[in-house]
């Protein structure tokens, strides 16, 4: 057993412990000292740092990292989508494309360097499973499907062997699931098929983009807004499709798509009633504030998320819509949008809530006996009074390092 002490230990599951200590055995936390309790032996002094669990990035698209810096911020979501399509030039991400895989490996390592231990990654190619595992991260790669015809070559059944192969590469660290893209890009039949596939799987966790833009809300309500023209522009017009006349959450709920193992990503445009419904279901809402503003959908109503009682996790989204994969930058953005939310709740979102949503809560998310010793140390200036507030608003990249145990 090895002992470590630091100016602050932030277990997340309890208030910060000043002049605290913890013990590690076999790469797992074996004990956390109670406030005021002396260490039972000589301890390695980590210095004036706050030790906290590695962060959890609950939503990103690592396979798009090859497009980093090529898609500019836009005034509207449809403008950003058009930029993305033009920049890609018809190129699709593939597992045998070294441009894609090399960029994904770099991005996964970058996420790790920023203090990330767990990740929820969206992938069309499943190229990122090996990249994530090689970077020392844990989590889920969601195989994203979209289409309005189950026989279009992207069907759930036809792609099952690809997921099985990828899951073997991921081992225990990186599991593979299946996920629908969004309400405007997936047919009701495919949603139901994906739900059946998830229910029959060992992972049973999925993710879906919901309520990201106001155009999505209009499209589902009565078929209006910018989406019909955009879908026609990309060659995916919804011929013969009847709008459900429902909000995004209500529509997915009617299809049986939402449960306590569903990650609902973005939620920028969701009404209070929809947020309360997510809370009652037990779904986790993943907010990506920097990306939302980059793609022109506006600022997410972070305070309303918490007020509605929704479980809130944090994601960066892809490097096509954000400068980096730094979750401390996301926390700073969340703090600006939600000044009344207690700092610990924001920290929980970037650690415990994300870990539990991705099914890795037994290993990550808090500093408690039995958890993996995946810990980061954040350097603290002398003037810090409220350590949790500092962590959500003032952390610099150079302040973050991994604790070597």
State what each model feature region is.
Residues 36-52:
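Active-site metal-binding motif and surrounding structural segment of the metallo-beta-lactamase
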Residues 50, 68-136, 158-171:
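Alpha-helical scaffold segments that flank or form the walls of functional sites
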Residues 54-65, 205-214:
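Histidine-centered catalytic micro-motifs
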Residues 356, 372-405:
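C-terminal cap of metal-dependent C-N hydrolases
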Residues 66-102, 140-148, 213-261, 334-341:
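Active-site gating loops and adjacent loop-to-helix segments of metal-dependent hydrolytic enzymes
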Residues 1, 40, 128-134, 158-284, ...:
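Histidine/acidic residue-rich metal-binding segments in metalloenzymes
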Residues 61, 124-125, 144-148, 179-183, ...:
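Active-site beta-loop-alpha junctions enriched in small/polar residues
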């Amino acid at each position: 057993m090895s002992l470590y002490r630091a100016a602050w230990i932030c277990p997340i599951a309890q208030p910060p412990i000043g002049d605290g200590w913890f013990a590690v055995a076999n790469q797992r936390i074996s004990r956390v000292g109670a406030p005021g309790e002396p260490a039972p032996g000589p301890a390695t002094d980590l210095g004036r740092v706050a030790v906290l669990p590695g962060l959890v990035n609950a939503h990103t698209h690592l396979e798009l990292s090859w497009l980093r810096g090529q898609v500019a911020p836009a005034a509207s979501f449809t403008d950003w989508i058009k930029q993305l399509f033009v920049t890609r030039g018809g190129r699709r991400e593939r597992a045998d494309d070294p441009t894609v895989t090399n960029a994904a490996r770099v991005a996964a390592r970058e996420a790790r360097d920023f203090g990330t231990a767990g990740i929820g990654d969206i992938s069309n190619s499943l190229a990122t499973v090996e990249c994530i595992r090689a970077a020392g991260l844990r989590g889920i790669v969601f195989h994203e499907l979209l289409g309005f015809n189950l026989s279009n070559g992207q069907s759930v059944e036809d792609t099952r062997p690809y997921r099985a192969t990828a899951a073997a590469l991921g081992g225990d660290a990186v599991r593979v699931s299946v996920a629908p893209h969004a309400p405007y890009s997936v047919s009701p039949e495919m949603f139901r098929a994906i739900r059946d596939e998830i229910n029959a799987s060992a992972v049973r966790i999925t993710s879906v983009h919901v309520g990201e833009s106001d155009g999505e809300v209009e499209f589902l309500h009565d078929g209006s807004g910018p989406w019909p023209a955009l879908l026609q522009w990309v060659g995916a017009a919804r011929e013969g499709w009847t709008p459900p006349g429902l909000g995004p959450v209500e529509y997915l709920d009617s299809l049986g798509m939402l449960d306590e193992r569903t990650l609902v990503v973005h939620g920028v445009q969701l009404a209070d009633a929809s947020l309360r419904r997510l809370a009652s279901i037990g779904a986790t809402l993943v907010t990506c504030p920097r990306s939302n503003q980059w793609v022109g959908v506006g600022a997410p109503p972070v305070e309303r998320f918490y007020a509605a009682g929704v479980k809130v996790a944090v994601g960066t989204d892809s490097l096509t819509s954000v400068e980096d994969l730094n979750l401390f930058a996301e926390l700073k953005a969340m703090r600006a949008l939600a000044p009344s939310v207690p700092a610990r709740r924001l920290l929980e979102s970037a650690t415990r809530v994300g870990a539990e949503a991705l099914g890795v809560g037994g290993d990550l998310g808090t500093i408690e006996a039995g958890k993996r010793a995946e810990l980061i140390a954040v350097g603290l200036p002398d003037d810090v009074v409220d350590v949790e507030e500092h962590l959500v608003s003032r952390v610099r990249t150079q302040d973050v390092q991994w604790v070597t145990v």
